[in-house]
Swiss-Prot record:
GO terms for molecular function: aminoacyl-tRNA deacylase activity; ATP binding; isoleucine-tRNA ligase activity; tRNA binding; zinc ion binding. A motif ('KMSKS' region) lies at residues 622-626. L-isoleucyl-5'-AMP binds at E581. Its EC number is 6.1.1.5. GO terms for cellular component: cytosol. Monomer. Its cofactor is Zn(2+). Binds 1 zinc ion per subunit. Catalyzes the attachment of isoleucine to tRNA(Ile). As IleRS can inadvertently accommodate and process structurally similar amino acids such as valine, to avoid such errors it has two additional distinct tRNA(Ile)-dependent editing activities. One activity is designated as 'pretransfer' editing and involves the hydrolysis of activated Val-AMP. The other activity is designated 'posttransfer' editing and involves deacylation of mischarged Val-tRNA(Ile). This is Isoleucine--tRNA ligase. Zn(2+) binds at C908, C911, C928, C931. Keywords: Aminoacyl-tRNA synthetase, ATP-binding, Cytoplasm, Ligase, Metal-binding, Nucleotide-binding, Protein biosynthesis, Zinc.
Length: 945
């Protein structure tokens, strides 16, 4: 490249090596990035990476599938860019690290969209066709968004849970876990959403504040004599009264079937204006105050003495349909934190209630379950039939009051379960569902699912490490997994069930395979259109097709089966090295994947789990529409560049919350500019350097150049150790320090004089350029995983013959003799230079000098510092960026100092140094001897700097 012509005549007369580069100072990222995305696609860069990586050890990051609905948001951007950084850094570390993106396609949100657009009365076949089309459209939209962020992957062949092959393999996975004995059907309270009309997974439940009625209700004595004896009395002092419960769900009272007391809690019989009331002794004072009563404790007894006593239903006086009694069952889960120390039990609407009643001999057919799937009571329920439970709440309170059973009615604000899709309250509701049993003995007599999964958690590496305890606790305490859903757009639980007994067809495993073969050809629609007689002949008179679909968490939770070992088995492998998702996935994809793999394979589907936090604004608030603090990644990419989003993510400790604001983005942009300016300097000063022709061997380099390369190699080793542990923010922090301080603040600063003023092909300049070449080789590669657009842009300027930086591996720096000692020596020199710089700044502030080149310094130093400084000889002035420098030996560190004086000599017009020999050549009165030699003779000789 030719030298850039300067405007001033002296520079034209005495040229310096000021070079230019096509790598511009301004990134113009919003304009250039989309061109790079097109370029990568057109030239098949991802495919070239795959071809280059063939035969290397595999590293598999398995993509947790985003849901195919809606635009990508900042959380998506964080997740996909983190994955991209992992994959790129692993490829550059010498692995074969493919990236196959995927999408979760079935389930409620898409079905809701179809209902919104086309109504609820569409035939199932049309729902499925429209759902497929909708999901496909959403995938294309999201895919474009992810590509725009610089994410490289198999975009032409992603996995989709709705692809026929994946749907078929999921049915086969279901067959396997049935064969292994994990699946059963039963009546159980499950999370139920009235708007979905379906059971919900634990991960689909969120908690929001809600105000509900809270009531204290009296269940009148049904067995006064037995009650008296339980309290050690011959008889009750009076007939009126009963046992008191507290509840926030009045709508469950019509279905009450029992009362729960703790066996070891002491209960009191309290004489009040409302009769004799039974409650926990330690709650008497608070309850009397709440009820507005005065009371006297007549007797006390332990809870276990009251077991099996019966009390009248509180609505018995309101309608004959409630003339029944409720027995006392003992339960360890009863507490005295609030209420009366007595829990009313409606087994259809509470997990503990259900478990307690079943343990006391209640059968499924005994359980009263009047709430239908849409939230209304059955028409035949006395007093409240046909009402929604929420509308019934005040009417139940009124009926209790009229029956004389209400002691208190207030409102209570509490955190309550809501559907994550509809944002509406949900309930526990006993329904007949298909479950995976956590503590069921599998067919082979081995460990239970819970035991296997807990062992698998222990065998998994967690980043950050606290994730292990969190997932362990979730698995240890979770209920059985409700596998079934009552929807259309989902993979069918393709069973034939006996119409009378509910038993599975004896040929179920064989029949599931037959269905899977059909689904492989026609999709899940094949089950909808299948005539049972095709597969089971006359048995169709006895068996009916099961209409349930699989929980969508089973879809994504079995991707290790139908993607890693199914649709993409040629690219991927089982188990994956890493699953990487937001921290909510401990109860979502990490969780469901662990359970399915534990059932299918007896192990986790991943070797490591990496968790990132959520995005918050600059004040630490969660992003929400109501606060108006959301940040759209598209908007930021189009205004500042996707590179700024990538750098923000890479520079943030993702193990906690990721804070973002305009102020934070401004700081990130400034950091980006500093890195870009460093790259521009490197590329400009290498633009006339041909490594094959101009490079010097390391032993011929100047000492500071050997130091710079040794230091860069040591830094790279640190960075690669961070990359290996997925620690990106220390990589960014160290690289920013490297660019601004180690290079910009020291090495490049020192180098400018040599690069600009030495003869273009001199050993001094070629030494500097050879070192810069190696530094640039290494720097661009370690930047590439996160600053992908910029690293590629710079790489193509640096090595135009190379197709892409992403097929490279991390740089092998040349060996530098005595590298550790060299780095230690120059670390010492930089420390002294810092003291000199401070002294120069003080002299400048006092108007004793202008630039540092106007100064001559004397450094008094002792010991190793003196030795290091003295070893540089006349080159010390270049390191200190002064026109003259001397070093004087002193005995003690306390005697060390820096003296600054203004030079008495003239300033060279070309190099700006103040030297005694300026004008020594009469024909060149403004030129120093050094510049004269560099321009017209053999050039100056340097050894250190």
């Amino acid at each position: 490249m030719s030298n850039k012509k300067a405007d001033s005549k002296p520079q034209a007369k005495y040229p310096v090596n000021l070079l230019d580069t096509p790598f511009p100072m301004r990134g113009d990222l919003p304009k250039r990035e989309p061109q790079w995305v097109k370029d990568w696609e057109a030239r098949g860069v991802y495919e070239k990476i795959r071809a280059t990586s063939q035969g290397r050890p595999k590293f598999i990051l398995h993509d947790g599938p985003p849901y195919a609905n809606g635009d990508i948001h900042l959380g998506h951007a964080v997740n996909k860019i983190l994955k991209d950084m992992v994959v790129k850094s692993r490829n550059m570390a010498g692995f074969d690290a493919p990236y196959v993106p995927g999408w979760d396609c079935h389930g409620m949100p898409i079905e809701i969209q179809i209902e919104k657009q086309f109504g609820k009365s569409l035939p199932a076949a049309e729902v499925m066709a429209k759902a497929r089309a909708y999901a496909t459209e959403q995938i294309e939209k999201q895919k474009a968004g992810f590509k725009r962020l610089g994410v490289l992957g198999e975009w032409g062949n992603p996995y989709k849970t709705m692809n026929f092959q994946n749907e078929a393999e999921e049915i086969r996975a279901l067959g396997k876990i049935i064969e292994k004995g994990y699946v059963y059907r039963g009546l159980k309270p499950v999370n139920w959403c009235f708007d979905c009309g379906s059971a919900l997974a634990e991960a689909e439940v969120e908690y929001k504040d809600r105000t509900d009625p809270t009531i204290d209700v009296l269940f009148a004595f049904a067995e006064p004599e037995k009650t008296a004896h339980a309290f050690g009395l011959a008889a009750l002092p009076r007939a009126e009264g009963g046992i008191v419960i507290w509840t926030t769900t009045p709508w469950t009272i019509p279905a009450n079937q029992a009362l729960n007391l703790h066996p070891e809690i002491v209960y009191a019989l309290v004489d009040t204006e409302r009769g004799l009331l039974v409650m926990a002794e330690e709650r008497v004072e608070a309850c009397m105050k709440d009820f507005g009563l005065t009371g006297r404790v007549v007797a006390t007894t332990r809870g276990d003495k009251l077991a099996n006593l019966r009390f009248h239903h509180p609505l018995a006086a309101a309608h004959p349909g409630y003339k029944r009694t409720s027995p006392v069952y003992l339960g360890d889960y009863v507490t005295t934190d609030t209420g009366t120390g007595i829990v009313h039990s409606s087994p259809a609407y509470g997990v503990e209630d259900f478990t307690s009643c079943k343990a006391h001999g209640m059968t499924d057919s005994d359980i009263i379950n009047p709430v239908m799937g849409d939230g209304r009571y059955i028409e035949s329920l006395p007093l409240f039939g046909g009402l929604t439970i929420w509308d019934a709440n005040p009417k139940i309170v009124d009926a209790l009051k009229a029956a004389g059973s209400l002691l208190r009615n207030e409102h209570y604000s509490h955190s309550y379960m809501h559907c994550w899709r509809h944002k509406t309250p949900i309930i526990y509701r006993a329904t007949s569902q298909w479950f995976a049993g956590m503590d069921t003995q599998p067919a082979d007599g081995g460990k239970t699912l819970r035991e296997t999964a807990l062992d698998a958690v222990d065998a998994t590496a967690f980043y950050p490490s606290w994730g292990k305890q969190r997932l362990h606790a979730m698995i240890a305490n979770r209920p059985d997994w409700t596998l079934s859903r009552q929807r259309q757009w989902g993979v069918p639980m393709a069973f034939f069930v006996h119409k009378e007994t509910g038993e599975l067809h004896p040929r179920t495993l064989e029949l599931l395979e037959e269905v899977a073969k059909r689904v492989e050809q026609q999709g899940i629609e094949a089950w909808q259109t299948l005539d049972a007689r095709e597969l089971i002949g006359d048995d169709a008179n006895l068996y009916e097709k099961n209409r349930d679909t699989l929980d969508v968490w089973f879809d994504s939770g079995t991707t290790h089966w139908h993607v890693l070992r199914g649709s993409h088995k040629d690219q991927l492998q089982f188990p994956a090295d890493l699953y990487l998702e937001g921290s909510d996935q401990h109860r979502g994809w990490f969780h469901s994947s662990l359970l399915t793999a534990s059932m299918l394979d007896g192990r986790a589907p991943y070797k490591g789990l990496l968790t990132h936090g959520f995005t918050v604004d600059g004040e630490g608030r969660k992003m929400s529409k109501s606060l108006g603090n959301g940040i759209d990644p598209h908007e930021v990419a189009n205004r500042l560049g996707a590179e700024i989003i990538r750098l923000w993510i890479a520079s943030t400790d993702y193990s906690g919350e990721l804070a973002i604001s305009e102020e934070i983005l401004k700081r990130v942009t400034e950091g980006y500019r500093r890195i870009r300016n460093t790259l521009r300097f490197l590329l400009a000063n290498l633009s006339d350097f041909d490594y094959a022709k101009d490079a010097l061997p390391a032993e011929q380099w100047l000492e500071i150049d050997r130091y710079a390369v040794a230091f860069s190699a040591q830094l790279q080793a640190e960075l690669l150790a961070h990359y290996e542990k997925y620690e990106f923010h220390p990589v960014v922090a160290k690289l920013q320090t490297f660019c601004s301080e180690d290079l910009g603040g020291f090495y490049l600063d020192v180098l400018k004089d040599r690069l600009y003023t030495s003869a273009p092909a001199s050993k001094a300049r070629r030494s500097a350029q050879t070192a810069l070449y190696h530094v640039t080789q290494g720097l661009l590669r370690v930047l590439a995983p996160f600053l992908s657009f910029t690293a590629e842009e710079a790489w193509r300027v640096f090595l135009p013959q190379s197709e892409t930086i992403f097929t490279e591996t991390y740089y092998a720096y040349p060996e530098i003799a005595n590298a550790d000692a060299l780095v230690a020596k120059w670390t010492l020199l930089r420390d002294v230079r810092g003291n000199v710089t401070k002294a120069l700044e003080e002299a400048r502030a006092a108007n004793r000098i202008g630039s540092s080149l106007q100064a001559q310094v004397e450094v008094r130093a002792s010991g190793a510092r003196y030795d290091a400084l003295a070893s540089l000889g006349d080159d010390l002035k270049f390191v200190l960026i002064t026109s003259a420098a001397t070093v004087v030996k002193v005995d003690a560190q306390s005697d060390e100092s820096v003296e600054v004086a203004a030079s008495k000599y003239q300033k060279c017009e070309r190099c700006w140094h103040y030297r005694e020999d300026v004008g020594a050549h009469a024909d060149h009165p403004t030129l120093c001897g050094r510049c004269f030699s560099n321009l017209f003779e053999n050039g100056e000789t340097r050894s250190a700097a």
